[in-house]
């Protein structure tokens, strides 16, 4: 059954805008999201700590009752944090300090030997790894070579497509990627730029297990509250009115 992972990074972004306060608390947001039916909580601990802090992930690990997906760069520092934290799984993502948000998928094919070691290090300690990648055949094959349990398909090009034809073409690329991933024995998640109005076609892709969504839910939560925003996204994923 398709599940929803709620990304709470943007709650921390608002908090960090006023660095002397502790509000809003992403921990409270995670609790409300779970109460509303979220199947998992996602948090990205970036190297520059621009939003989520180590304090946040440490408390989340103790309080999340569904599962905790820690997004992080494949650096020595972050691997050590993950090994100590022991999240339910880790999603490895690329990072550039100048980007506003993650702009593309991980180049697994170009960094295969290094990522082989990172994946082995984490999974040998019973922390499943997901690789955030573009829907590209070479990246899919390289991801399978690492031994990672999951991939997370980057849906940004689909979400940001300027025309309906472009969006249909990007959706087709995602569908092909799903078919290849299943043939390679990879489990499939997806995320980036998904909204209440574009999520359903991605939710219907073959083998899709979890969608990780943050900005759209948090934007709506400002207007209608966290619990309603999460419930409505679950309905949108099913193609039901909300």
Curated annotation (Swiss-Prot):
SUPFAM superfamilies xrefs: Pyridoxine 5'-phosphate synthase (SSF63892)
Binding-site residues for 3-amino-2-oxopropyl phosphate, renumbered to this chain: 7, 18, 193, 214-215
Positions of the catalytic residues: 44, 71, 192
Entry GO CC: cytosol
Known EC number: 2.6.99.2
Subcellular location: Cytoplasm
Record's function text: Catalyzes the complicated ring closure reaction between the two acyclic compounds 1-deoxy-D-xylulose-5-phosphate (DXP) and 3-amino-2-oxopropyl phosphate (1-amino-acetone-3-phosphate or AAP) to form pyridoxine 5'-phosphate (PNP) and inorganic phosphate.
Name of the protein this chain belongs to: Pyridoxine 5'-phosphate synthase
UniProt lineage: Bacteria, Bacillati, Cyanobacteriota, Cyanophyceae, Synechococcales
